[in-house]
Amino acid sequence: MIKENFIKLYENSFRENWDLPCYTDYGENTQYTYGQVAEEIARLHLLFKHCSLRRGDKISVIGKNNAHWCIAYMATITYGAIIVPILQDFSPNDVHHIVNHSESTFLFTSDNIWDNLEEEKLTGLRGVFSLTDFRCLYQRDGETIQKFLKNLDKEMHSSYPQGFSRENIQYTTLSNDKVMLLNYTSGTTGFSKGVMLTGNNLAGNVTFGIPVSYTHLRAHETDSYL
């Protein structure tokens, strides 16, 4: 059992490092501070709340590594849902299988990957979102996702009339023994198999790396990290 709560580790990190750089897309000028990432997470949380997502609901993400991939991942876990990361080099059939087998409600995807998927084979999805700008690429009949996203700025102002600040970061309370991630590996036979990872698994990796990172950072303060 890891002493530090996985979700609270990130909640505290966003607060303490509010003005520092958090994510940068390689080869681009796009950069997010910890505070900006926390605000993007808050926007996605409002969407999840609007759609009545609950603890244990699954959200898949597939695409190249970028800031929005990380934001979708963090927004899912800090809301209390379960993230399902999918390798971007999986075939469309494998992606269809993983999304359906995991019973994912939402899918965040690169536009080019979505172009090669067949929405009629993803019967459980309520919404699909672009990792380029989080716009809605698909909503199931009867959903109001696209309409909500058009008014998201107003929803943010209504929820945070004084503006979003570090004091507004209050993520769900979830013990480390709960499943937070379904990891599908490339199967040697048939379709890929899913592995359930808990907060303890994830917190163990994070807490192990923190002392090593701090030691290196003190010696190399101007370095960037992948």
Indicate residue ranges for each PLM-predicted region.
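A short N-terminal helical cap/helix-turn-helix that marks the beginning
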Residues: 1-22
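Flexible, low-complexity linker/hinge segments
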Residues: 1-5, 137-179
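Conserved AMP-binding/adenylate-forming core of the ANL superfamily
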Residues: 2, 22-66, 70-74, 91-96, ...
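Conserved AMP-binding A3 loop
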Residues: 33-35, 171-172, 180-206, 226
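Conserved structural elements of the adenylate-forming
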Residues: 38-44, 176, 195-218
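Hydrophobic alpha-helical segments in the ANL/AMP-binding
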Residues: 49, 67-86, 95-96, 207-210, ...
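Structural core segment of the AMP-binding/adenylate-forming
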Residues: 51, 78-157
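Conserved small/polar residues in nucleotide/adenosyl-binding loops
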Residues: 185, 215-222
